[in-house]
Amino acid sequence: MAFQRRRNNYYNRLRRLLPFICAVSGALLILFALLSILSPPPDDSDRRISKHINYGANDEKKNTPVVFTVPRGGGRSDRDIWRSWNAEFFYGCCNASSKFPNAKAITRNDRYLAIATSGGLNQQRTGIVDAVVAARILNATLVIPKLDQKSYWKDASDFSNIFDVDWFMSFLSKDVKIIEKLPQKGGQTWSPRRMRVPRKCNEKCYINRVLPVLQKRHAVQLNKFDYRLSNKLRDDLQKLRCRVNYHALKFTDPILEMGNELVRRMRKRSKHFIALHLRFEPDMLAFSGCYYGGGEKEKKELGTIRRRWKTLHVNNPEKQRRQGRCPLTPEEVGLMLRALGYGSDVHIYVASGEVYGGEKSLAPLKALFPHFYSKDTIATKMELKPFSSYSSRMAALDFLVCDESDVFVTNNNGNMARILAGRRRYFGHKPTIRPNAKKLYKLFMSKENTTWEEFASRVRTFQKGFMGEPKEVRAGKGEFHENPAACICEDTDAKVKAGKMDSRKFGKKEQKEDEDAELSSSETDYEEDQTDLQDRGLYNGTRLDYDDALSVSEEPELEEMLSD
């Protein structure tokens, strides 16, 4: 009986507390609901366009709630923003030495090498350059390379539609014998033995793998020929690479004339101009696995594109960005340039495909640099008609304008960026800016909590070693097409006369630096960045190696789409 009374008392107390518990719970639910409504979503703001930034506002607008005010002018700079430091003391040098025999003396009449290139215009260019060297290694006659007409780009152009064939053959006549097509055998066109060599195949590799087949079959075609030659070759072969890339490969007259006209129109608008290879296309962003704060719409759009590539695993977007693997947004590129000293009066030529987000993404960049052009805005549709149906010819026009620009800015390290970087080093070290994305990441994320002066100072510090200046990268480091150190000489006599001789001792003009010299911090940053790209298999703009047959069959478009 006593037990029953105690149990009744317990339930009575519980019933009296129940309304109070319900009231407290209800109040908490209402509080949480209010907080969820009033609080912004965590880290889901659109990074393509920053809030609370005033682009070039006057100091009078003191009531505007702006934390980060970007000046209209570039400010005072401690450097000439239109030329590289000490560039006048370096020059391209790729003449053959007296020990490099003439092609007639070493070419075997029963050896023919053909190649089939791969990818977009600039990836194919690397294949053409290396094919000449491969033919020289094998003492073979080179057949004019076949351009890729079946990949993602679906460009029906052949070699003669892009490059001047006669000039190519005549300029290299002392180095390699070149013919337009294989000779006939028994009244029929010679059918070559098709094969493929590994990536980065060196001289010994070609002798061991290709030469025995060539000696037996006399005609060999190397397929998917891109980056199939080692970065490290003896100097006379490296100089041959440079003769091909910087002198023998000349665009056809129609391309040159239109490209030069585009440059003339840019020069008519301004004495100096910047060319920007933006690379903010949907395909590029989808492949990178990066996220720019566009919410579910962005995730769905880029996710749909990304699913085309079955071999890509799911990335951590924040980790990708921290490690410098994400292209800068158009706004971030603009802020970097302003911090480096380029004011709103600077004219910019943009080489880009479809920009993700369209005008919304481009708006901050255009606000920073209103003098904003592309080939479509400075040329008529009628003028571009002979080129517009061919992706390689359109890319060639952009290539020419970017090459002739006073400053070239690249937002990724694809083939076009690397080839132009090497070419601009060879022809006078014209400024070539590549964002140090790994270091800039945190700075961009916290920019609205700092002053412009502090932001600009840190950008300038982080970009040391990424500006295309002489000796920025140690000889032999990185991709040869980007850093053709064997083909760049130093005029030490002129440097001594100018009173700018380095404290280190220099020997002859072509003497290499001591390999054990201590790296500067900026060079270390650069080399870490290149090593990271190589480790991820992205050094030539892709995760896939064509040596993997399974990858080829599953991902036929991946490399071509992202290569340039």
From Swiss-Prot:
Note the InterPro entries from the entry: FucosylTrfase_pln, GDP-Fuc_O-FucTrfase
Membrane topology field: Single-pass type II membrane protein
Cellular component terms per the entry's GO annotation: membrane
Q: Where does substrate bind?
A: 277-279
Q: Which GO terms describe its molecular function?
A: glycosyltransferase activity
EC assignment: the record states 2.4.1.-
Specify the protein name: O-fucosyltransferase 6
Taxonomy of origin reads: Eukaryota, Viridiplantae, Streptophyta, Embryophyta, Tracheophyta
Q: Which gene encodes it?
A: OFUT6
